[in-house]
From Swiss-Prot:
Domain of life: Viruses
Protein's UniProt name: Uncharacterized protein 094L
Bias-annotated ranges (Basic and acidic residues): 28-38
Disordered: region residues: 28-52
Amino acid sequence: MDPEGMMYGFGVSFGISWAILKLFGREKKGKDRPREDGTQQQPSESKGEAACRDAAYRITGKRFEKIRHKGIVNPDTGRALELDCYSKSLKTAIEYQGRQHYEYVSVFHKGGRQDLRKQHERDCYKRAACQKLGIKLIEVPYTVKDIEGYLRKVL
C-alpha cells in the first residue's frame, strides 16, 4: 500500500473512532446537564451564579448568559470583565457576590490582602461602567438565602 493510502486509512479510522466515542462515550457529569430553559451551566459557574441564572429565568422567562462585555474593560489588564448573568434584551446583569467580594479569602486572593483591594476596585469599576452603559446591575450577596425571593423584589 502506498503511503498516501495509509494516511487516508488512518484518517478514516480515526474519524470513525472519534464519532463512536462522541456518540457512545461516557455520560456527562451532572454539572453539564441542560437546564429547563435549554442552556447549560458554565463549567466555571458557582452554585450561587447558577441559582441566580435559574431564578432570573423563572421570573422573567428570559435567558441570562455569562458574558465578557466589551464595553466593561478592566483598566489594569485591558480584558473585558465578566458579568455572571446578563440579559441583552432586558439590559440587566446579575452578579452573585461570593464571600471573596467582602473579605479576604486566601483561595481567591493569592497575591495577599492587596488582591481584596483590587477586587473592590474591579467591583466599583463594574458598577460605574454598567451605569454608564445603561445596564441595570443587580448584586446578590452570598448571605442571601432566598435568591429567587431577593431577585423578585429587584427585577
